[in-house]
């Protein structure tokens, strides 16, 4: 839940970054679930399109990552996720990315 308190700050930074970033820069944004993807899509309107990890009607509770998802995460400039309480499957991949 403490990550939800940080969400307004992160969204503010992303919206400010869209004004600072040159138009031709390719910002790679990834969202873990559809509600976060929707917010990121709204903020990135005209700048780019975020990728989504849990697609369709998939549930983040029992989700299994594929190698293609790991590659998307590794190439991302910004990752939106709720936290390890909801998205346990992202805990290890994000900690390994953070070490790099």
Where are these regions (language model features)?
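Twin-arginine (Tat) signal peptide motif
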Residues: 2-8
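Bacterial N-terminal signal peptides
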Residues: 8-19
